[in-house]
From Swiss-Prot:
One of its GO terms (cellular component) is cytoplasm. One of its GO terms (molecular function) is glutaminase activity. It comes from Vibrio vulnificus (strain YJ016). The gene is hisH1. HAMAP family: HisH. The keyword Protein transport does not apply. Pfam families: GATase. Keywords: Amino-acid biosynthesis, Cytoplasm, Glutamine amidotransferase, Histidine biosynthesis, Hydrolase, Lyase. Its main location: cytoplasm. This is Imidazole glycerol phosphate synthase subunit HisH 1. Pathway: Amino-acid biosynthesis; L-histidine biosynthesis; L-histidine from 5-phospho-alpha-D-ribose 1-diphosphate: step 5/9. One of its GO terms (biological process) is L-histidine biosynthetic process.
Length: 204
């Protein structure tokens, strides 16, 4: 399995080193690239992201990555903002934008500000995740396992949801739409459970 071509898509706004290290610790070689040939010949792809949705989509556009990501046929895992970018639109405008941010549209989710009641934003720290039974991404991971989150926006629970988390209200912790997967938490910062999830993805 370690002979797979594993690629982290170089979005220009993501801190990829911790994701790269987490994959390498499992015995895989990793390439960071935005080259279409490298991306489309990969066996597994990661789409990490930090910052705002508007910033990230602008970076994808400037690097000609929007159509490229949509062409991917092998499993792709979006992490944190990378997962949110798989949705249709996001309310996370950044400071200057005054309308919804159009995202990649690879799943039906619309990213919204978390409704947390009296709980503070951002949602930061460890929280339990409840996965749908039988999804291979969570194989061998105990129900109610803890994962590490840092975010203020999320997708509501919908048909695309394969795992949920509760913070004031339920939100989507993981999605799947065909070959596109996404996790709102940071598996690379989530200890053994996170490592297991990355391994599960690499073994799909």
């Amino acid at each position: 399995m370690t002979e797979q071509k594993v690629v982290i898509i170089d979005t220009g706004c993501a801190n990829v080193s911790s994701v790269k290290f987490a994959i390498e610790r499992l015995g895989y070689d990793v390439t960071i690239s935005k080259d279409p040939q490298v991306v489309l010949s990969a066996d597994k792809l990661f789409l990490p992201g930090v910052g705002t949705a508007s910033e990230a989509m602008k970076n994808l556009e400037e690097r000609d990555l929007i159509s490229l990501v949509k062409q991917v046929e092998k499993p792709l895992l979006g992490i944190c903002l990378g997962m949110q970018l798989l949705g249709k639109v996001s309310q996370e405008k950044g400071q200057k934008a005054d309308e919804l941010v159009e995202c990649l549209g690879l799943c039906d989710g619309e990213v919204k500000l978390l409704q947390t009641g009296d709980l503070p934003l951002p949602h930061m720290g460890w929280n339990t995740v409840s996965a749908k039974a039988g999804n291979p991404l969570f194989k061998g991971i105990e129900e109610g396992e803890y994962f590490y989150f840092v975010h203020s926006f999320a997708m509501p629970v919908g048909d695309y949801t394969i795992a949920e988390c509760e913070y004031g209200n339920s939100f989507t912790a993981a999605v799947q739409s065909g070959n596109y997967y996404g996790v709102q938490f940071h598996p690379e910062r989530s200890s053994k459970a996170g490592a297991k999830l990355i391994q599960n993805f690499l073994e799909l």
